[in-house]
Curated annotation (Swiss-Prot):
Residues 1-27 are annotated as: Disordered. The keyword Cell membrane applies. This is Rho-related GTP-binding protein RhoV. Belongs to the small GTPase superfamily. Rho family. It holds the Pfam family Ras. Its main location: membrane. NCBIfam families: small_GTP. It comes from Bos taurus. It comes from the Eukaryota.
């Protein structure tokens, strides 16, 4: 069942779920900062709203810089993930770059039915990310996947003399070229692969933080195996 449509009042701001009584004090909460970047109107805000609220924004509202916070359980351990929704407009480049340095994982987003947004991944977004944060993992995310086979969208692309939807093999090839953790396509409207996108982001961030702590020889830090942390993700 697709998510219900949210009014503007419902979708902004988001409220953080309250942890169950006693769970928060049982074990320390791991914090993860996840930043979404990409051209304007590719659906970054919709991804966050659909994932955290099980709803879909009623209308497009350009974002300057919004933050959202939710708690999830990863193999029974509490994890707080901060989702940073950034603007794609050039006049906000300086503001956007301020949130990059301490980011644990990036979602580089493009719309599968906007070839120009795909091109800008290598021309704008990856260079911008790496200028301010050379090490954090990056996931390449194709958004609006529900429109890939939409007849009206295909007609509009053809009439406008533009290219068709971005082919999946081409996107996968780019992910390998830029050394992204993976390439995933999803839809905020239907929620297809939506959870997989954020699960993968959380896993990549956890492994990245573990590697950094290991390099710093922090006492008591153990390497987190992929299979252990991938077993279970759920909202608290």
């Amino acid at each position: 069942m697709p998510p219900r449509e949210l009014s503007e009042a419902e979708s902004s701001p988001l409220r953080s779920p309250t942890p169950p009584p006693g769970r928060g004090s049982a074990s320390p909460e791991l914090g993860i900062k996840c930043v979404l970047v990409g051209d304007g109107a590719v659906g970054k805000s919709s991804l966050i709203v659909s994932y955290t609220c099980n709803g879909y924004p009623a209308r497009y509202r350009p974002t300057a810089l919004d933050t959202f916070s939710v708690q999830v359980l990863v193999d029974g351990a509490p994890v707080r993930i901060e989702l940073w929704d950034t603007a794609g407009q050039e006049d906000l480049d300086r503001l956007r770059s301020l949130c990059y340095p301490d980011t644990d994982v990036f979602l580089a987003c493009f719309s599968v039915v906007q070839p120009s947004s795909f091109q800008n991944i290598t021309e704008k977004w990856l260079p911008e990310i790496r200028t301010h944060n050379p090490q954090a993992p990056v996931l390449l995310v194709g958004t609006q996947a529900d429109l890939r086979d939409d007849v009206n969208v295909l007609i509009q692309l053809d009439q406008g003399g533009r290219e068709g939807p971005v082919p999946q093999p081409q996107a996968q090839g780019l992910a390998e070229k830029i050394r992204a953790c993976c390439y995933l396509e999803c839809s905020a409207l239907t929620q297809k692969n939506l959870k997989e996108v954020f699960d993968s982001a959380i896993l990549s961030a956890i492994e990245h933080k573990a590697r950094l702590e290991k390099k710093l020889n922090a006492k008591g830090v153990r390497t987190l195996s992929r299979c252990r942390w991938k077993k279970f993700f759920c909202f608290v």
